[in-house]
Regions:
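N-terminal chloroplast transit peptides
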Residues: 1-6
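Non-catalytic substrate-recognition and accessory regions of acyl/acetyltransferase enzymes
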Residues: 7-143, 147-164, 168-208
Length: 208
């Protein structure tokens, strides 16, 4: 029987909130200049604005730094990408599953992972969540997955991410991201990021 860390619930959430209350950035969210997530510990940031990521605005033909916001939802973490007008471009919810003990006969490698839920891309007209009032930003879904991957590394889940894709988005996850069906449950609907695809994902569009 696997033992799951309590960090995806009360303990971890309160630790990050307490840390953030003593953080200079948390007390001063209006710091000057672009704050990319490249070298930032995302998990240690409190709720609210945490930094920027670079996206290509296909509609306008420009590169834009969009804002990243974070909040907690019943022990899970939610991240939002918003443009400078405050419109939401995309969002994602993450659940951290850190296993301290697991069956080595079933799992050849550490099964700890970040479970991705409710990944929504509002800027892409080819997704069911498209908001026609929003400009089309290239790489929105990829940036959200990179945040999930970063949180997996920070939480010592060895970069593993897992999700259950919608039927219309499976080709995106398999062909572009390189995800595969969970080999420990081949009859299930979950997909994982295999080891050889972790670094390529982290470098897409120049990385976070």
């Amino acid at each position: 029987m696997m033992k799951v860390s309590a960090q995806n619930n009360f303990i971890y959430t309160n630790y990050t909130q307490n840390y953030a209350q003593n953080s200079v950035k948390a007390k001063s969210p209006s710091f000057c200049g672009a704050q990319r997530l490249t070298h930032m510990n995302i998990g240690m940031m409190g709720e609210g604005f945490i930094g920027n990521v670079l996206l290509k605005n296909v509609t306008k033909g420009t590169d834009e730094l969009v804002n990243v916001f974070k909040n907690f939802d019943c022990g899970n973490e939610k991240y939002f990408l918003k443009n400078n007008e405050g419109g939401t471009i995309g969002e994602i919810m993450l659940k951290i599953n850190k296993y301290f003990d697991y069956n080595r006969f079933i799992y050849k490698e550490d099964p700890s992972h970040v479970f991705v839920d409710k990944l929504r891309n509002y800027s892409n007209p080819n997704t069911p969540f498209w908001n026609k009032e929003t400009d089309f930003y290239e790489g929105t879904g990829t940036r959200l997955l990179q945040i999930a991957q970063r949180r997996s590394d920070e939480a010592q889940c060895v970069g593993n991410i897992k999700l259950i894709p919608m039927p219309e988005s499976r080709r995106y996850y398999t062909d572009k991201i390189g995800m595969i069906k969970d080999p420990t449950n081949p009859y299930g609907s979950a997909f994982i990021l295999p080891p050889d695809k972790k670094e390529p994902l982290s470098k897409m569009y120049g990385g976070l």
